[in-house]
């Protein structure tokens, strides 16, 4: 049966019967392993791979210099952008699924499945932003974060995407929409649990806060430009080359 503390994905993984109660210290190696695997998966950057393999270039030397979907679209076209989009979403989903399998089937310890799914998602996004394979220079983590929230908390995702669209529509700043949505992620997630009078698991709360801080930090230059009124605005009527990307 669905448990709010476990979430949608976790409710699928916990259908199997738990076979043991494990103390927290016995779970530490599994937690560390999942964090490392998620980080290494997140470090695989589809934009860099596609641009190098198929175009003989590093996308980070083109356009805005961001290794993300928008910059791929601008420089290499729709097919390259779709490949990047799918790759970035898959690595986040796979990281979460691994945590769900390890902590869902045959496990009944002090950490919930959803908590570990959030932790895995966090480390995958850290890998995307600071990829070990590419000199720790990656994307901004917006798409990866959106993928994680969509998988683990679809209702929270819907609320945040409405806020994002509203802010972008009225301000024309995509970066501002990303920052505000990310900043409100921990608040909306906490509110979601509060509506059902359920306490949010600690690691889930911590992961959401760290993600919000990370996304805001990644957009620090955008915020400076917004303050100086030099940040490019999104144009719905005519094509205008933006100065930065959001992936």
Where are these regions (language model features)?
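Short, non-helical or kinked segments that cap or interrupt transmembrane helices
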Residues: 57-69, 133-146, 173-182
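Interfacial segments of multi-pass membrane proteins
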Residues: 73-78, 99-103, 123, 141-171, ...
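Short, strongly hydrophobic alpha-helical membrane anchors
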Residues: 1-27
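Hydrophobic residues within alpha-helical transmembrane segments
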Residues: 86-90, 163, 180-184
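Cytosolic, membrane-interface loops and tails of multi-pass inner-membrane proteins
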Residues: 48-79, 138, 224-247
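Transmembrane alpha-helix interface/packing and boundary motifs in multi-pass membrane proteins
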Residues: 37-43, 48, 83, 125-135, ...
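Loop-to-transmembrane alpha-helix initiation sites
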Residues: 158-160, 174-182, 199-208
């Amino acid at each position: 049966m669905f448990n709010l503390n476990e979430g949608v994905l976790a409710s699928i993984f916990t259908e199997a019967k738990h076979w043991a109660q494990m103390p927290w210290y016995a779970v530490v190696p599994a937690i560390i392993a999942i964090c490392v695997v998620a980080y290494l998966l997140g470090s695989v950057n589809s934009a860099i791979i596609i641009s190098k393999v198929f175009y003989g270039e590093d996308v980070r030397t083109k356009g805005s210099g961001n290794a993300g979907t928008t910059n791929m679209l601008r420089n290499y076209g729709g097919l390259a952008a779709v490949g990047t989009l799918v790759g970035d979403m898959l690595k986040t989903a796979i990281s979460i699924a691994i945590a769900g399998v390890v902590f869902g089937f045959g496990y009944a310890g002090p950490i919930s499945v959803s908590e570990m799914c959030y932790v895995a998602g966090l480390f995958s996004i850290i890998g995307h932003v600071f990829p070990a394979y590419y000199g720790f220079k990656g994307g901004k983590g917006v798409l990866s974060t959106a993928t994680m929230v969509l998988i683990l908390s679809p209702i929270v995702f819907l609320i945040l995407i409405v806020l994002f669209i509203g802010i972008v529509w009225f301000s024309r700043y995509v970066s501002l929409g990303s920052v505000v949505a990310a900043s409100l992620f921990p608040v909306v997630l906490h509110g979601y649990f509060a509506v059902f009078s359920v306490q949010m698991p600690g690691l889930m709360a911590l992961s959401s806060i760290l993600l919000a801080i990370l996304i805001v930090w990644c957009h620090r230059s955008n915020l400076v430009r917004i303050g100086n009124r030099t940040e490019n605005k999104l144009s719905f009527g005519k094509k205008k080359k933006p100065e930065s990307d959001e992936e």
